[in-house]
């Protein structure tokens, strides 16, 4: 079964820690802490994410411990 974009869940969070390979520890609004990597569009356009930035994270309902950073506020 192919997952559509409608199946993804979006949360707003704050970057707590910068990890290697464009990976971040993000604290979501609901106080959960997840690991998130940078989306390809952000990597391609060289958008920098720094400690304390507010970000929009996209997650799959199947694994709520990992996500993808899709927007920086």
UniProtKB/Swiss-Prot annotation:
UniProt keyword RNA-binding, yes or no: yes
A GO molecular function held by the record: ribosome binding
Keywords of this entry: Cytoplasm, Initiation factor, Protein biosynthesis, RNA-binding, rRNA-binding
Name listed for the protein in its UniProt record: Translation initiation factor IF-1
Similarity comment text for this entry: Belongs to the IF-1 family.
Job description of the protein: One of the essential components for the initiation of protein synthesis. Stabilizes the binding of IF-2 and IF-3 on the 30S subunit to which N-formylmethionyl-tRNA(fMet) subsequently binds. Helps modulate mRNA selection, yielding the 30S pre-initiation complex (PIC). Upon addition of the 50S ribosomal subunit IF-1, IF-2 and IF-3 are released leaving the mature 70S translation initiation complex.
Location within or outside the cell: Cytoplasm
Source organism phylogeny: Bacteria, Pseudomonadati, Pseudomonadota, Alphaproteobacteria, Rickettsiales
Gene Ontology CC terms: cytosol
Pfam families tied to this protein: eIF-1a
Subunit structure and binding partners: Component of the 30S ribosomal translation pre-initiation complex which assembles on the 30S ribosome in the order IF-2 and IF-3, IF-1 and N-formylmethionyl-tRNA(fMet); mRNA recruitment can occur at any time during PIC assembly.
Main location: cytoplasm
Annotated organism of origin: Rickettsia massiliae (strain Mtu5)
Domain S1-like, first and last residues per copy: 1-73
InterPro entries given in the database record: NA-bd_OB-fold, RNA-binding_domain_S1_IF1, TIF_IF1
Domain of life: Bacteria
